[in-house]
Amino acid sequence: MILQDWLKELDYTLIQGNPDTQVEEVIYDSRKAGPGTVFVAMTGTRIDAHCFIPDVLKAGTRILVTERPIDMELEACELDEEEKKKITILRVKDSRRALALLSAARFGYPAKKLTLIGVTGTKGKTTTTHMIKTVLEAAGKKAGLIGTTGVVIGEHVT
């Protein structure tokens, strides 16, 4: 797959590099980094994943999605200047949103292929949702159910 194909829904600024780059996976866990991965650096309440950028670059990742400038992290990595020029860096306002959009693109926008039915009310929601699921399955449709009694996908109940 080509990174550019994953970027259609994403609002980003290309800091450096080439979005016509081969990609295989989008990650946010630096321990899963490697060639072909897009690392999305998110700032959390305890950890700022931007600090793991030298690690993901060492592991072979060459595509970074960041929320802020990463000059210090690039200086800290063990790549020579020529290799650093090969890194593609995308800046976004919200890394979590970027991760969601990149993941959706990676898997072919599965939500666009789903029909969602919501049931609200005071009484009868569980009965109604199970009836809808039964009718859909009788019509040959695949149906899942998420409710207060659990999650049902096909015959699997959690």
What are these regions (language model features)?
Residues L7-L10, R97-T158:
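Phosphate-binding loop of NTP-binding sites
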